[in-house]
């Protein structure tokens, strides 16, 4: 499926992939797999790829494929408050309200579509924020996100604040 996206992303205007099959194992490091080359190519093409980190409360790793390079690892905070739950590890790049990390990842993929459109319509120069558009969008979302401390892991994560991300993009006009 990833190869199909690589081959057809221009024809069908594919810009975002919600990669949601998880292996439910705590990986502290990437696990070499057959999809790594495809993830690198998608990233190079400017296609956002993210995956949920898992729902086991791990603090020593996250599920595959979120553990892989060129795949952004999305965690969860409890809806209605900023309590990080489910898997919590330093590889998580952004947390989003959701009962499970799969729903958090779906929300961030929708946010990425909106942010990408805002960048295109506003003429925002994303190159100052990253080498690729996915890297730039992640940086924007992290820098405008709300800091959420997790006492259980000792880590601080950034929670998506789409309005602040959009305000940053449109303020640069």
Label the model's feature ranges.
Residues 34, 66, 86, 129, ...:
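Short acidic-hydrophobic sequence patches enriched in Asp/Glu that either
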Residues 149-173:
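Caspase-like cysteine protease fold
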Residues 22, 76-79, 145:
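Flexible loop residues that form catalytic
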Residues 15, 72, 161:
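Conserved acidic residues
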């Amino acid at each position: 499926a990833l190869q199909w996206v690589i081959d057809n992303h221009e024809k069908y205007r594919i810009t975002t992939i919600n990669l949601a099959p998880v292996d439910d194992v705590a990986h502290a490091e990437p696990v070499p797999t057959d999809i790594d080359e495809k993830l690198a190519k998608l990233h190079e093409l400017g296609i956002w790829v993210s995956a949920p980190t898992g729902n086991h409360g791990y603090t020593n790793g996250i599920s595959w494929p979120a553990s892989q390079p060129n795949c952004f690892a999305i965690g969860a905070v409890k809806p209605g408050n900023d309590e990080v739950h489910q898997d919590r590890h330093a590889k998580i790049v952004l947390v989003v309200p959701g009962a499970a990390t799969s729903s958090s990842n779906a929300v961030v993929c929708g946010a990425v579509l909106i942010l990408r459109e805002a960048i295109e319509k506003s003429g925002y120069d994303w190159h100052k924020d990253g080498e690729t558009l996915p890297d730039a969008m992640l940086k924007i979302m992290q820098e405008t996100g709300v800091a959420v401390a997790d006492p259980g892991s000792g880590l601080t994560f950034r929670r998506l604040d789409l309005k602040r991300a959009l305000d940053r993009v449109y303020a640069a006009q």
